[in-house]
Protein backbone atom coordinates (compact mmCIF):
# COMPACT_ATOMS: atom_id res chain seq x y z
CA UNK A 1 0.00 0.00 0.00
CA UNK A 2 1.28 3.47 -0.89
CA UNK A 3 2.57 5.00 2.35
CA UNK A 4 1.60 8.50 1.17
CA UNK A 5 -2.06 7.44 1.30
CA UNK A 6 -1.90 6.92 5.07
CA UNK A 7 -2.95 9.69 7.42
CA UNK A 8 0.08 10.72 9.46
CA UNK A 9 0.45 12.75 12.62
CA UNK A 10 3.68 14.63 13.20
CA UNK A 11 5.41 16.53 16.03
CA UNK A 12 4.91 15.77 19.73
CA UNK A 13 6.77 16.90 22.85
CA UNK A 14 7.02 15.57 26.40
CA UNK A 15 8.67 17.27 29.38
CA UNK A 16 9.39 15.74 32.80
CA UNK A 17 8.89 18.38 35.49
CA UNK A 18 9.47 18.54 39.23
CA UNK A 19 5.74 18.36 39.95
CA UNK A 20 4.39 16.41 36.96
CA UNK A 21 4.70 16.11 33.21
CA UNK A 22 3.67 18.14 30.17
CA UNK A 23 2.58 16.55 26.88
CA UNK A 24 2.03 18.71 23.79
CA UNK A 25 1.36 18.21 20.08
CA UNK A 26 0.45 20.24 17.03
CA UNK A 27 -2.79 19.44 15.20
CA UNK A 28 -1.92 18.76 11.56
CA UNK A 29 -2.32 15.34 9.91
CA UNK A 30 -0.91 14.85 6.42
CA UNK A 31 -1.40 12.42 3.55
CA UNK A 32 1.72 12.80 1.43
CA UNK A 33 1.93 16.51 0.63
CA UNK A 34 -1.78 17.03 1.33
CA UNK A 35 -2.98 18.50 4.64
CA UNK A 36 -5.70 15.97 5.46
CA UNK A 37 -6.74 17.41 8.83
CA UNK A 38 -6.17 20.63 10.74
CA UNK A 39 -7.72 19.38 13.97
CA UNK A 40 -6.10 15.97 14.46
CA UNK A 41 -6.13 14.66 18.03
CA UNK A 42 -2.74 13.34 19.11
CA UNK A 43 -2.96 13.32 22.93
CA UNK A 44 -5.11 10.66 24.57
CA UNK A 45 -5.93 10.10 28.23
CA UNK A 46 -5.17 6.46 29.05
CA UNK A 47 -5.73 6.47 32.82
CA UNK A 48 -6.58 9.03 35.51
CA UNK A 49 -3.04 10.42 35.56
CA UNK A 50 -1.57 9.02 32.33
CA UNK A 51 -1.59 10.40 28.80
CA UNK A 52 -0.15 9.25 25.49
CA UNK A 53 0.95 11.23 22.44
CA UNK A 54 1.05 9.74 18.96
CA UNK A 55 3.14 10.47 15.88
CA UNK A 56 3.04 8.43 12.68
CA UNK A 57 0.15 6.50 11.18
CA UNK A 58 -3.12 7.78 12.64
CA UNK A 59 -4.93 4.46 12.16
CA UNK A 60 -2.17 2.45 13.85
CA UNK A 61 -2.01 4.93 16.73
CA UNK A 62 -5.76 4.85 17.32
CA UNK A 63 -5.71 1.05 17.35
CA UNK A 64 -3.04 1.11 20.06
CA UNK A 65 -4.94 3.71 22.08
CA UNK A 66 -8.03 1.50 22.10
CA UNK A 67 -6.05 -1.59 23.09
CA UNK A 68 -4.02 -0.01 25.86
CA UNK A 69 -7.00 1.90 27.31
CA UNK A 70 -8.91 -1.35 27.70
CA UNK A 71 -5.90 -3.12 29.24
CA UNK A 72 -5.46 -0.26 31.71
CA UNK A 73 -9.11 -0.46 32.78
CA UNK A 74 -8.94 -4.25 33.15
CA UNK A 75 -5.82 -3.98 35.31
CA UNK A 76 -7.55 -1.46 37.59
CA UNK A 77 -10.64 -3.68 37.90
CA UNK A 78 -8.56 -6.73 38.82
CA UNK A 79 -5.99 -5.11 41.11
CA UNK A 80 -8.00 -2.19 42.51
CA UNK A 81 -5.15 0.14 41.60
CA UNK A 82 -3.76 1.78 38.47
CA UNK A 83 -0.99 0.14 36.49
CA UNK A 84 2.35 1.95 36.77
CA UNK A 85 3.58 3.95 33.80
CA UNK A 86 6.52 1.58 33.42
CA UNK A 87 4.14 -1.40 33.45
CA UNK A 88 1.91 0.24 30.86
CA UNK A 89 4.81 0.97 28.52
CA UNK A 90 6.18 -2.55 28.94
CA UNK A 91 2.82 -3.87 27.77
CA UNK A 92 2.85 -1.46 24.82
CA UNK A 93 6.41 -2.49 24.00
CA UNK A 94 5.36 -6.16 23.93
CA UNK A 95 2.42 -5.37 21.62
CA UNK A 96 4.65 -3.40 19.23
CA UNK A 97 7.41 -6.02 19.35
CA UNK A 98 4.90 -8.73 18.49
CA UNK A 99 4.06 -6.81 15.32
CA UNK A 100 7.67 -6.45 14.16
CA UNK A 101 7.06 -8.23 10.84
CA UNK A 102 3.99 -6.07 10.17
CA UNK A 103 4.95 -3.03 12.24
CA UNK A 104 2.56 -0.40 13.50
CA UNK A 105 4.13 2.80 12.15
CA UNK A 106 4.07 4.97 15.25
CA UNK A 107 6.21 6.85 17.72
CA UNK A 108 4.64 7.18 21.15
CA UNK A 109 5.21 9.14 24.32
CA UNK A 110 3.53 7.84 27.47
CA UNK A 111 3.69 10.12 30.48
CA UNK A 112 2.05 10.90 33.75
CA UNK A 113 2.33 10.55 37.50
CA UNK A 114 2.18 7.32 39.50
CA UNK A 115 3.38 6.08 42.89
CA UNK A 116 6.97 6.47 41.66
CA UNK A 117 6.52 10.11 40.67
CA UNK A 118 6.45 11.85 37.26
CA UNK A 119 7.68 9.82 34.28
CA UNK A 120 7.73 9.80 30.49
CA UNK A 121 8.65 6.87 28.25
CA UNK A 122 9.21 6.98 24.49
CA UNK A 123 8.44 3.98 22.28
CA UNK A 124 9.26 3.26 18.65
CA UNK A 125 7.55 1.06 16.06
CA UNK A 126 9.68 -1.98 16.98
CA UNK A 127 8.84 -1.76 20.67
CA UNK A 128 11.98 0.03 21.81
CA UNK A 129 11.18 1.56 25.21
CA UNK A 130 13.25 4.36 26.78
CA UNK A 131 12.57 6.24 30.00
CA UNK A 132 13.13 9.95 29.38
CA UNK A 133 14.47 11.93 32.33
CA UNK A 134 14.20 15.45 30.88
CA UNK A 135 12.53 16.39 27.59
CA UNK A 136 11.76 14.44 24.42
CA UNK A 137 10.25 15.06 20.98
CA UNK A 138 8.98 12.71 18.27
CA UNK A 139 7.85 13.03 14.67
CA UNK A 140 8.99 14.92 11.61
CA UNK A 141 9.42 18.25 13.41
CA UNK A 142 11.43 16.80 16.30
CA UNK A 143 14.86 18.10 15.14
CA UNK A 144 13.62 21.70 15.39
CA UNK A 145 11.81 21.00 18.66
CA UNK A 146 14.92 19.43 20.19
CA UNK A 147 16.93 22.58 19.46
CA UNK A 148 14.63 24.54 21.77
CA UNK A 149 14.29 21.79 24.39
CA UNK A 150 18.05 21.28 24.70
CA UNK A 151 18.66 25.01 24.99
CA UNK A 152 15.96 25.92 27.51
CA UNK A 153 15.25 22.86 29.68
CA UNK A 154 16.61 23.16 33.23
CA UNK A 155 16.58 20.99 36.33
CA UNK A 156 13.65 21.67 38.64
CA UNK A 157 11.37 23.02 35.91
CA UNK A 158 7.72 23.04 37.01
CA UNK A 159 4.67 22.21 34.90
CA UNK A 160 3.80 25.84 34.18
CA UNK A 161 7.32 26.50 32.90
CA UNK A 162 7.22 23.16 31.09
CA UNK A 163 3.99 24.13 29.36
CA UNK A 164 5.57 27.33 28.03
CA UNK A 165 8.68 25.42 26.89
CA UNK A 166 6.60 22.78 25.10
CA UNK A 167 4.63 25.45 23.23
CA UNK A 168 7.86 27.23 22.27
CA UNK A 169 9.38 23.98 20.97
CA UNK A 170 6.32 23.17 18.85
CA UNK A 171 6.08 26.75 17.59
CA UNK A 172 9.62 26.48 16.23
CA UNK A 173 8.93 23.07 14.70
CA UNK A 174 5.82 24.41 12.96
CA UNK A 175 7.82 27.24 11.38
CA UNK A 176 10.19 24.85 9.57
CA UNK A 177 8.34 21.53 9.19
CA UNK A 178 5.59 21.57 6.56
CA UNK A 179 3.95 18.49 8.12
CA UNK A 180 3.42 20.31 11.44
CA UNK A 181 0.97 23.12 12.09
CA UNK A 182 -2.60 24.30 12.69
CA UNK A 183 -2.43 24.96 16.40
CA UNK A 184 -1.18 23.29 19.56
CA UNK A 185 -2.74 20.96 22.15
CA UNK A 186 -1.23 20.85 25.64
CA UNK A 187 -1.92 18.59 28.61
CA UNK A 188 -0.34 18.90 32.04
CA UNK A 189 -0.51 16.05 34.53
CA UNK A 190 0.23 16.39 38.23
CA UNK A 191 -0.76 14.42 41.32
CA UNK A 192 -3.84 16.65 41.40
CA UNK A 193 -5.13 15.52 38.03
CA UNK A 194 -5.03 15.44 34.24
CA UNK A 195 -5.73 18.85 32.70
CA UNK A 196 -6.11 19.79 29.04
CA UNK A 197 -5.11 23.43 28.60
CA UNK A 198 -7.69 25.76 27.08
CA UNK A 199 -6.96 27.07 23.57
CA UNK A 200 -7.06 30.66 24.81
CA UNK A 201 -4.31 30.00 27.34
CA UNK A 202 -2.12 28.38 24.67
CA UNK A 203 -2.77 31.32 22.35
CA UNK A 204 -1.54 33.75 25.03
CA UNK A 205 1.75 31.86 25.26
CA UNK A 206 2.08 31.89 21.47
CA UNK A 207 1.46 35.65 21.34
CA UNK A 208 4.39 36.21 23.69
CA UNK A 209 6.65 34.22 21.35
CA UNK A 210 5.90 36.25 18.23
UniProtKB/Swiss-Prot annotation:
The keyword Hydrolase applies. It catalyses: Cleavage of peptide bonds with very broad specificity. The formation of the proteasomal ATPase PAN-20S proteasome complex, via the docking of the C-termini of PAN into the intersubunit pockets in the alpha-rings, triggers opening of the gate for substrate entry. Interconversion between the open-gate and close-gate conformations leads to a dynamic regulation of the 20S proteasome proteolysis activity. It is found in: Cytoplasm. Its EC number is 3.4.25.1. Coiled coil: none annotated. GO terms for molecular function: threonine-type endopeptidase activity. The keyword Cell inner membrane does not apply. The active site is at 10 (nucleophile). Keywords: Autocatalytic cleavage, Cytoplasm, Hydrolase, Protease, Proteasome, Threonine protease, Zymogen. Residues 1-9 form a propeptide. It comes from the Archaea. SUPFAM superfamilies: N-terminal nucleophile aminohydrolases (Ntn hydrolases). GO terms for cellular component: cytoplasm; proteasome core complex, beta-subunit complex. It holds the Pfam family Proteasome. The 20S proteasome core is composed of 14 alpha and 14 beta subunits that assemble into four stacked heptameric rings, resulting in a barrel-shaped structure. The two inner rings, each composed of seven catalytic beta subunits, are sandwiched by two outer rings, each composed of seven alpha subunits. The catalytic chamber with the active sites is on the inside of the barrel. Has a gated structure, the ends of the cylinder being occluded by the N-termini of the alpha-subunits. Is capped at one or both ends by the proteasome regulatory ATPase, PAN. Belongs to the peptidase T1B family. Component of the proteasome core, a large protease complex with broad specificity involved in protein degradation. HAMAP family: Proteasome_B_A. This is Proteasome subunit beta. It comes from Methanohalophilus mahii (strain ATCC 35705 / DSM 5219 / SLP).
